[in-house]
């Protein structure tokens, strides 16, 4: 899950993030975080090798040592885009975002600040925030098992059913579109809905085409990535 922490400077945002990360890691969650500053700052330094790479035209520039790897991109990137990249690449259970004003993720307000869209908690105690995050992670994990069709055949949308399952009021088998075939389709890093029929067609078609290829074996996880097609150049018209 993704959650944002926002508030004025010196309101205690970073301290809360520290405490939340420690509490979640202690409970076995994999946690990643993003820190945003409204100031025009850079961690790169003029004259350093990475700076020289950038001035020569390289962007982004990656610095790698025996203890860390840092990517420096000399342009602003939205919170949603950074979050999408981190969730796709590192797959944390929880991604904590400190400081961004925008973003489609749920947010926690700290201090005396005007509530932003998507605010779910205001000045919560650490224990209450941890419980909220734990519950949302559990709901997200159940949602990953549901087809995401929001067909309403169970009497709820998929998120509502997931929350009812986490609360112990419903069970996974209550989903009328649940398939034994686990097909997950992501477009731009976001999952799109696929019911029994679509899942069955995709699974049968892909595995059928791959069955004759060397390296394929029944029961193995198959991942296919479709890159955007480059637009074809229009043929030049010669005039007589």
Tell me the role of every PLM-derived stretch.
Residues 188-212:
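Short, hydrophobic/π-rich interface segment
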Residues 147-163, 176-177:
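Local cysteine-cluster metal-coordination motifs and their immediate loop/turn environment
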Residues 165-180:
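Non-heme iron-sulfur electron-transfer modules
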Residues 21-74:
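N-terminal phosphate/diphosphate-binding loop that engages ATP/GTP or pyrophosphate donors
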Residues 113-145:
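Ser/Thr/Gly-rich flexible loops in soluble cytosolic domains mediating phosphotransfer, phosphorylation
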Residues 70-111:
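Glycine-rich phosphate-binding loop used to anchor ATP phosphates in small-molecule kinases
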